[in-house]
Every structure is written in structure tokens, then in C-alpha cells.
């Protein structure tokens, strides 16, 4: 099965905050194997339209798939859903790679620039931008002061370290019942 950290990451990435509580039991049913949306609704005691909304969000994210079949007696379509655990891993790795890329860009920007700030907290400028403003805040006219951004650099490095060392490169999932 997928571990708790990966499941929480999936929910955070795909499901809205309002749907989070309802999504967990839907995901738990889905992870047990192929199941219809009606069966999920019965097992979770959630309204069918809520279950379907969550399932379609998972489908849009590529972590769930469905097969449509027609009931010969009623002529109604039945949707049998399946969880795609390998897609979860791919999605989360992609998202984490994007976060790492953006953090590296932010780190490079902070390390390669000198900053000046308005003493009243209005703006933060790079040296070039502050020069264009004659080291004067365009909002209040106060002089700008040099800003030591070493704390910001350290915070970015710490966050980057968390993402680079969190083990998402080695996510393990086992096959879900097919």
C-alpha cells in the first residue's frame, strides 16, 4: 500500500481543503481494489455526487481510472474505478522536482543580489532597482537601508534540504488488488 505521507501529499495536491475529510474514506475504498462509485457511496455513507466529484478529481490528476460498462437488464452505465498507485508516485515526484527547482532559483536570486528596504517596510529592492529609485521609497519618500538577507538564504537552504532529503526519490508502493 501507499504510505501515509504519500497519501497525505496526494490529498493535498488533488483535493480541495473542503473535500479533504470526505476524500480520505473514498481513497481508502479505492485503494482496496476495483470498485463502483455506488459501492463507495454505500461504504462511506457519502452522497453519490460527492463521491463522484472526488473520483473525477482523482481521474483528472491521473491517479484513478475507470471502466464503463452497461448493465444488460437496466441499460444503465456502471463505472468501475481503479486506483493507479504508480501515477501517484510520478505526480508527487514531479511536484517535488518543481518545488526544488523554484527553491534553487530563489536561492540563486538571493545569493546573487544585494537588497535595500524601505525603513517603513513598504518595499524591498535589488541594488539595481534601488539605484533607479535613488535609494528612496517610492511610496513614502524614506531612505532605503541595506538589508542583510542571510536569514532568508538560510531559510531557503533549510527548506531545500527538506525537499531534497525527504525520500520522495525512493517512494515505495505495492501493487493494489487489480
From Swiss-Prot:
Belongs to the TFE family. InterPro entries: TF_E_archaea, TFE, TFIIE/TFIIEa_HTH, TFIIE_asu, TFIIEa/SarR/Rpc3_HTH_dom, WH-like_DNA-bd_sf, WH_DNA-bd_sf. Monomer. Interaction with RNA polymerase subunits RpoF and RpoE is necessary for Tfe stimulatory transcription activity. Able to interact with RNA polymerase in the absence of Tbp or DNA promoter. Interacts both with the preinitiation and elongation complexes. This is Transcription factor E. Keywords: DNA-binding, Transcription, Transcription regulation. Pfam families: TFIIE_alpha (PF02002). Transcription factor that plays a role in the activation of archaeal genes transcribed by RNA polymerase. Facilitates transcription initiation by enhancing TATA-box recognition by TATA-box-binding protein (Tbp), and transcription factor B (Tfb) and RNA polymerase recruitment. Not absolutely required for transcription in vitro, but particularly important in cases where Tbp or Tfb function is not optimal. It dynamically alters the nucleic acid-binding properties of RNA polymerases by stabilizing the initiation complex and destabilizing elongation complexes. The gene is tfe.
